[in-house]
Amino acid sequence: YPTLISSQIEFILQNSNTKLVFVENQEQLDKIKSSFNSCSDLKYIVVMDDSCDQETENVMNLATLFDKGKEFTQNNNLSFTKMIESINEEDILTLIYTSGTTGIPKGVILTHKNLLSNVEATLKVAEFNSNEKFLSFLPLSHVLERMGGHYTAFAIGATIYYAENIEKVADNLGETNPTIVVSVPRLFEKIHTKFIEGLKTAPKLRRKLFFWALGVGKKYSNMKLNNKKPGAVLSLKHGLADKLIYSKVKARLGGKIKFFVSGGAPLS
C-alpha cells in the first residue's frame, strides 16, 4: 500500500526475502532506501516514473531497466518464452500482505493455480472479451483488484485504465468510458447516495419517472437473472425507461458500462 510507513515496508521486505522492488516515484523510493542495508536479500530498486536523478548499480529508473533487458536478450539464449514455459501451476505467483491495520502484516501465499482457477471461473460466467476497458482504482495490493481487475484483464487481452486517485474516479469514468469497474461496496454506496441526493432537488415528475424506471428495471433484471423472457409489455416499458432514465444514468458513468463487479464485503 502506498500509505505504508518505512518500518512496515522494511518488515515486508525482510519477511518475503524480496530481491527487487518496483516503486512508483521518488517519495516511495525514499521510504525504501533507508531499509536497504537491513534487508540482506534486497538487490535492486526500480523507479517507474523515471524520477530518480541519482541512479546507482542498485537503484535505477524503469527506462534503464528496459535498456539492460534489451542488452541481456541480445547476449543470452534463455528466451522470455522459455522462462514462462518453465513455470509450474503450483509455483508461487504472488505474496499478498494484509494491510497491517490490526497488527503485523501477514503474507498470503498464492500459486498460479490459485489465481488462474478464479480467473477461469470468472470467464465461464461473465461474457468478457478483448475489447473490454477496465477502470482500476483499488490498490493492487488488494486481492480483489489483483484478481478481478488485473489478472482477469490480462487473460482476455483487455485494456486497463488506472484512476488518478479515489477523488478523481467520477472524472475518470467520463474520460475513459470503461465497460467494467471492479470495486468494493463503499464505492457503489457513494454512487447510489449521489443519485438519491440529486433527486431530492429534482422536479416531482422527474422523481416519479426515476422510481418508476427503477421498478421496471428490477422486474426486467429478475426475469433475465432467472433465465425467463420478459413479456412484451415489460419489454416495452424497459425500452421507454432506457430512453428516459437509464441512458442518462449510463452517460454519467461513462456511457459504456456493462458490469459493475462488487466484492470484499456484501452489498447492502
Regions found by a protein language model. Give the residues of each.
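Structural core segment of the AMP-binding/adenylate-forming
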Residues: 1-68
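Short hydrophobic/charged patches on amphipathic alpha-helices used for structural packing
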Residues: 10, 81-84, 170, 246
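Adenylate-forming
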Residues: 26-41, 188-204, 243-255, 267
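Conserved pre-ATP/AMP-binding loop-to-beta segment of ANL
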Residues: 47, 66-97, 104, 127-133
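Conserved AMP-binding A3 loop
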Residues: 63, 93-119
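Conserved AMP-binding/adenylation subdomain of ANL enzymes
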Residues: 116-133, 140-243, 256
